[in-house]
């Protein structure tokens, strides 16, 4: 499985490198340290002929701002809805060389072992950033805990918000909080 992810990333990187093959300078790619920078560094290791400089992102650094300013040539960390949201926020348009894997998202609870034990009016913490909030809502829908407006069909291409919930049979309370706070909130939510 890990090899498949590296292979997929290699294909995606090859696509993005195709247009830069004539450039003399290294291709500078911004990436989160794990797993994206690890994948890029693995690719560099298996193909040393690639002139690739991996720029690892630190907390608070926006890779799209780096791309817009020319500090990097490409970035590798986001899915299409996040990219579209960033284009609006930055007033820029970026080219997509290839789409790649999306990090998994899960549902966790310290209080309940399965979805059927989730009580009426349970509080569910979700990330408050646009794209991960949408992914969380699609995940809740996949477990039949809510239903989104039918116009939201694909989490890879559309962004849903709590306003787009059309059915909520358990009357879940959706609590939007900062992503790093979610693990700390598990004792306070359902």
List the model feature ranges, each with a label.
Residues 92-101, 173-175:
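Short beta-strand->loop
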Residues 1-5:
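N-terminal secretory signal peptides that target proteins for export/translocation
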Residues 97-147:
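A conserved helix-loop-strand patch within extracytoplasmic ligand-binding domains
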Residues 7-18:
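Bacterial N-terminal signal peptides
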Residues 18-24:
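Sec/Tat signal peptide C-region and signal peptidase I cleavage site
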Residues 51-59, 149-158, 171-178:
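Short beta-strand-to-loop elements that line the ligand-binding cleft
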Residues 30-53, 62, 66:
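Short, polar/charged alpha-helical segment
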Residues 46, 61-75, 88, 137-139, ...:
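Short helices/loops that flank or line small-molecule/ion binding pockets
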């Amino acid at each position: 499985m890990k090899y498949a992810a590296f292979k997929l990333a290699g294909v995606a990187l090859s696509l993005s490198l195709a247009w830069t093959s004539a450039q003399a300078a290294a291709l500078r790619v911004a990436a989160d340290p794990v797993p994206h920078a690890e994948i890029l560094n693995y690719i560099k290791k298996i193909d040393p002929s690639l002139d690739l400089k991996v720029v690892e992102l630190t907390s608070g650094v926006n890779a799209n701002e780096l791309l817009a300013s020319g500090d990097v040539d490409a970035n590798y960390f986001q899915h299409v809805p996040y990219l579209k949201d960033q284009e609006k926020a930055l007033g820029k348009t970026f080219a997509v060389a290839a789409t790649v894997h999306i990090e998994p998202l899960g549902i966790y609870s310290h209080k309940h072992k399965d979805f059927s034990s989730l009580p009426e009016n349970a509080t569910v913490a979700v990330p408050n950033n646009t794209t991960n909030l949408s992914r969380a809502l699609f995940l809740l829908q996949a477990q039949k805990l809510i239903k989104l407006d039918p116009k939201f069909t694909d989490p890879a291409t559309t962004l849903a918000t709590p306003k787009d919930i059309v059915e909520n049979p358990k009357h879940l309370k959706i609590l939007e909080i900062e992503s790093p706070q979610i693990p700390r909130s598990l004792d306070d939510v359902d």
